[in-house]
């Protein structure tokens, strides 16, 4: 992200965020031989576990949520209850979809407009979330709209306007390898920039509410791993952005 003339019209919180995201004067370039060696070593280690799963006739998809759960408490991970959607669990998905719409929306839409559109689009999906959204009561809809709008408002208060020159992408999916017995996959909340000519320019941001926890950085490292395996170029910066505090933790 480069400096813009609009910086003089930003709030202190937005200026602080822009300072963090701004690309440094010196380009960030990782040693290509080291990256190639890392990828080779990682692939070799993964092949060991692939062989074990193939012998059992099983496959495995590794996600951020799975890693967080199993590293937090293996017993709880093995005995986890069936997931059910409710207002509390749907807030994050609805807010993230609204922010995704914001990155490509022309003009300056009201946060509530984005949330309404988010709910409408998610309701059309033939899945369990769509079923919940189409069947929820008026009271639940009001609670969900208010909570998701609060997150979108905090996002717009904390981030500078996402100009197209920033190359903003919300909910960007990454998987590696494309198929196989073991596949790693994730979806980052927000990415800015892109790698160019071997230079690391991409910034990966995970949006959070509440306080910071140690596993949050583990989740960001997982995204950085996926980006490195997919492109051969690590991201320039990974950061958790805490909406309630209006601050990023790189």
Question: What does each model-identified segment do?
Answer:
Residues 1-91:
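C-terminal, charged and often intrinsically disordered regions of DNA end-processing helicases
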Residues 78-82, 128-140, 175, 204-208:
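Short acidic, glycine/Ser/Thr-rich loop/turn "cap" segments at secondary-structure junctions
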Residues 87, 91, 95, 107, ...:
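Hydrophobic (often cysteine-bearing) scaffold residues that line and stabilize catalytic clefts
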Residues 98-171:
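A non-catalytic, helix-rich entry segment at domain boundaries
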């Amino acid at each position: 992200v480069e400096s813009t003339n609009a910086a003089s019209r930003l709030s202190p919180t937005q200026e602080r965020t822009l300072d963090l995201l701004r690309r440094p004067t010196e380009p960030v370039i990782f040693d290509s031989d080291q990256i190639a060696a890392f990828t080779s070593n990682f692939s070799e280690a993964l092949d060991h576990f692939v062989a074990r799963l193939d012998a059992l006739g099983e496959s495995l998809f590794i996600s951020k949520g799975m890693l967080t759960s199993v590293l937090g408490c293996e017993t709880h991970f093995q005995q986890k209850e069936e997931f059910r959607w409710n207002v509390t669990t749907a807030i994050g998905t609805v807010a993230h979809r609204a922010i995704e719409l914001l990155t490509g929306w022309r003009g300056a839409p009201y946060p509530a407009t984005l949330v309404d559109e988010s709910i409408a689009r998610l309701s059309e999906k033939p899945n369990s979330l769509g079923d919940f959204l189409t069947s929820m009561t008026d009271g639940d809809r009001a609670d969900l709209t208010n909570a998701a709008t609060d997150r979108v408002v905090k996002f717009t208060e904390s981030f500078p306007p996402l100009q197209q020159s920033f190359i903003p992408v919300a909910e960007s999916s990454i998987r590696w390898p494309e198929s196989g017995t073991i596949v790693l996959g994730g979806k980052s909340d927000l990415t800015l920039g892109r790698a160019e000519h071997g230079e690391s320019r991409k910034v990966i941001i995970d949006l959070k509410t509440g306080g910071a926890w140690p596993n949050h950085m583990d989740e960001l490292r997982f995204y950085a791993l996926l980006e490195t395996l997919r492109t051969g170029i690590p991201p320039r910066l990974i950061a958790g952005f805490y909406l309630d505090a209006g601050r990023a933790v790189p």
